[in-house]
C-alpha cells in the first residue's frame, strides 16, 4: 500500500485533472460546503406534508403517485401544481389520458391560463416533450397522467392482438435514465401518476403491481400509495371521500408513514379539515363534545362548521398550520434551525 502522503498527492492530482476536464465542482468533498435545506412543494394536505417528513414534495426529484381508480391521485398532483404556481413557479401537465378537466383544476386553485398542457399521441412523444420542457430550465413542476397511457408508437401503429412485450418498460427505463439528471439540475419536480394492475398466479403477498416496469420504482425518490377508505356524507348525500396515503418509499425521510385527509367533491383536498384533524391530534385545537376551540375561542360546532370558519378566516388557518408544523419540526426555515441547537440540520423550507 502506498504511503499516506503519496496517496493524498495522487488524489489531489486526480481531482485537479477532473476539474480541468469536466469543470470546477465536478467532484467535491461533502463537508466543503454547508448543505442547503431541501426545497419542497406543499401537497395541499398538512397530514401528507408531515408524513413526507420534509413538508411537501421534494424539488428536483421523481415522484410516483399510484392507486386504484378515483382514489385522488390526480387531485393530489393538481394541488401540488397549484401550490407551485402560487409560489411563482411554472407548471406543465402531460395529459396522456386526454382526461384533464380544466374546470376542476381551476377549482383546486390551478391557474389554467398559465398551465402548460400537452396531449401527446404516443408515449415517445410525451416523454420527449417532457424532456425538452425540463431541459429548458424554466419549469418547476411537471405532471405525467398517467404512465399506463404512455403507449409506445409501435403498439399504436400495430394491429390489435399484436404482442408488444416489454416495450413500455424499455421506454420508461430509457426516459428516466435521461431525465433524472436534468430534473436535479433544474430543480424540477416530476410527478408520475400510475395505475394498478394485478399479477396473475400470485398466491402469497399482494398481487397488485404498477404499470411501466421497474424503472420508475427505482428512480422515484418518493412513492405514494393513495386509497379511498370512506365516503363522506351529509345526510343522505355523498359529499366526498376520506383518503389514506401511505409513503411506500421515501429517500428524503423515514418511509411508511400514513396520512389521512378528506377530498371534497368539486373542491379537492380539504386543507381546513386537515388542519383541524392534526390540531386536535397534537393538542393545539381542543375538542369538547362536538365543539372545536383554539386558544379559548370557539371555531364551531361540528367539523363542517369549523371547516367553514377556518375557510372564512385564512389568517387563523395559516397560523394553526404554522403551529402544527413547528411542533412537529416540519417546515422549519434555515434561520430557525440554526437558532435551536437540538434541531436537525436538514429541514425543509416552506416552498421556494
UniProtKB/Swiss-Prot annotation:
<keyword id="KW-0233">DNA recombination</keyword>
<dbReference type="InterPro" id="IPR020588">
    <property type="entry name" value="RecA_ATP-bd"/>
</dbReference>
<keyword id="KW-0547">Nucleotide-binding</keyword>
<keyword id="KW-0238">DNA-binding</keyword>
<dbReference type="GO" id="GO:0006310">
    <property type="term" value="P:DNA recombination"/>
</dbReference>
<keyword id="KW-0742">SOS response</keyword>
<dbReference type="GO" id="GO:0003697">
    <property type="term" value="F:single-stranded DNA binding"/>
</dbReference>
<comment type="function">
    <text>Can catalyze the hydrolysis of ATP in the presence of single-stranded DNA, the ATP-dependent uptake of single-stranded DNA by duplex DNA, and the ATP-dependent hybridization of homologous single-stranded DNAs. It interacts with LexA causing its activation and leading to its autocatalytic cleavage.</text>
</comment>
<dbReference type="Pfam" id="PF00154">
    <property type="entry name" value="RecA"/>
</dbReference>
<dbReference type="InterPro" id="IPR049261">
    <property type="entry name" value="RecA-like_C"/>
</dbReference>
<dbReference type="InterPro" id="IPR020584">
    <property type="entry name" value="DNA_recomb/repair_RecA_CS"/>
</dbReference>
<dbReference type="InterPro" id="IPR020587">
    <property type="entry name" value="RecA_monomer-monomer_interface"/>
</dbReference>
<protein>
    <recommendedName>
        <fullName>Protein RecA</fullName>
    </recommendedName>
</protein>
<dbReference type="InterPro" id="IPR003593">
    <property type="entry name" value="AAA+_ATPase"/>
</dbReference>
<dbReference type="GO" id="GO:0140664">
    <property type="term" value="F:ATP-dependent DNA damage sensor activity"/>
</dbReference>
<dbReference type="GO" id="GO:0016887">
    <property type="term" value="F:ATP hydrolysis activity"/>
</dbReference>
<dbReference type="GO" id="GO:0005829">
    <property type="term" value="C:cytosol"/>
</dbReference>
<dbReference type="InterPro" id="IPR023400">
    <property type="entry name" value="RecA_C_sf"/>
</dbReference>
<dbReference type="InterPro" id="IPR049428">
    <property type="entry name" value="RecA-like_N"/>
</dbReference>
<dbReference type="GO" id="GO:0005524">
    <property type="term" value="F:ATP binding"/>
</dbReference>
<dbReference type="InterPro" id="IPR027417">
    <property type="entry name" value="P-loop_NTPase"/>
</dbReference>
<keyword id="KW-0067">ATP-binding</keyword>
<dbReference type="GO" id="GO:0009432">
    <property type="term" value="P:SOS response"/>
</dbReference>
<keyword id="KW-0227">DNA damage</keyword>
<dbReference type="GO" id="GO:0006281">
    <property type="term" value="P:DNA repair"/>
</dbReference>
<dbReference type="InterPro" id="IPR013765">
    <property type="entry name" value="DNA_recomb/repair_RecA"/>
</dbReference>
<comment type="similarity">
    <text>Belongs to the RecA family.</text>
</comment>
<dbReference type="Pfam" id="PF21096">
    <property type="entry name" value="RecA_C"/>
</dbReference>
<keyword id="KW-0963">Cytoplasm</keyword>
<keyword id="KW-0234">DNA repair</keyword>
<feature type="binding site">
    <location>
        <begin position="67"/>
        <end position="74"/>
    </location>
    <ligand>
        <name>ATP</name>
    </ligand>
</feature>
<dbReference type="GO" id="GO:0003684">
    <property type="term" value="F:damaged DNA binding"/>
</dbReference>
<feature type="compositionally biased region" description="Basic and acidic residues">
    <location>
        <begin position="335"/>
        <end position="352"/>
    </location>
</feature>
<feature type="region of interest" description="Disordered">
    <location>
        <begin position="332"/>
        <end position="352"/>
    </location>
</feature>
Amino acid at each position: 500500500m502506498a504511503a499516506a502522503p503519496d496517496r493524498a498527492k495522487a488524489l489531489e492530482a486526480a481531482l485537479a485533472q477532473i476539474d480541468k476536464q469536466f469543470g470546477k465542482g465536478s467532484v467535491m468533498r461533502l463537508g466543503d460546503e454547508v448543505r442547503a435545506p431541501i426545497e419542497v412543494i406543499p401537497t395541499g394536505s398538512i397530514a401528507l406534508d408531515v408524513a413526507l417528513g420534509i413538508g411537501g414534495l421534494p424539488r428536483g426529484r421523481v415522484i410516483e403517485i399510484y392507486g386504484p381508480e378515483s382514489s385522488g391521485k390526480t387531485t393530489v398532483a393538481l394541488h401540488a401544481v397549484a401550490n407551485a404556481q402560487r409560489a411563482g413557479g411554472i407548471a406543465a401537465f402531460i395529459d396522456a389520458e386526454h382526461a384533464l378537466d380544466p374546470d376542476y383544476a381551476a377549482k383546486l386553485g390551478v391557474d389554467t391560463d398559465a398551465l402548460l398542457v400537452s396531449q401527446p399521441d404516443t408515449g415517445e412523444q410525451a416523454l420527449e416533450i417532457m424532456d425538452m420542457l425540463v431541459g429548458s430550465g424554466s419549469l418547476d413542476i411537471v405532471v405525467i397522467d398517467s404512465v399506463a397511457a404512455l403507449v409506445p408508437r409501435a403498439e399504436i401503429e400495430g394491429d390489435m392482438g399484436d404482442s408488444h412485450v416489454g416495450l413500455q418498460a424499455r421506454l420508461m427505463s430509457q426516459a428516466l435514465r435521461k431525465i433524472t439528471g436534468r430534473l436535479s439540475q433544474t430543480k424540477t419536480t416530476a410527478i408520475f401518476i400510475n395505475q394498478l394492475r394485478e399479477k396473475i398466479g400470485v398466491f402469497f403477498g399482494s398481487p397488485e403491481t404498477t404499470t411501466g416496469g421497474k424503472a420508475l420504482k427505482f428512480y422515484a425518490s418518493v412513492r405514494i400509495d393513495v386509497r379511498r377508505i370512506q365516503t363522506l356524507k351529509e345526510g343522505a348525500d355523498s359529499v366526498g371521500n376520506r383518503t389514506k396515503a401511505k409513503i411506500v418509499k421515501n429517500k428524503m425521510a423515514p418511509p411508511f408513514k400514513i396520512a389521512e385527509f378528506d377530498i371534497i367533491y368539486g373542491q379537492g383536498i380539504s386543507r381546513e379539515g386537515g388542519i383541524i384533524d392534526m390540531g386536535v391530534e397534537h393538542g393545539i385545537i381542543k375538542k369538547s363534545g362536538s365543539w372545536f376551540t383554539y386558544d379559548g375561542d370557539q371555531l364551531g360546532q361540528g367539523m363542517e362548521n369549523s371547516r367553514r370558519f377556518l375557510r372564512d378566516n385564512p389568517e387563523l388557518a395559516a397560523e394553526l398550520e404554522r403551529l402544527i408544523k413547528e411542533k412537529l419540526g416540519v417546515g422549519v426555515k434555515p434561520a430557525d434551525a440554526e437558532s435551536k441547537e437540538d434541531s436537525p440540520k436538514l429541514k425543509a423550507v416552506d416552498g421556494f
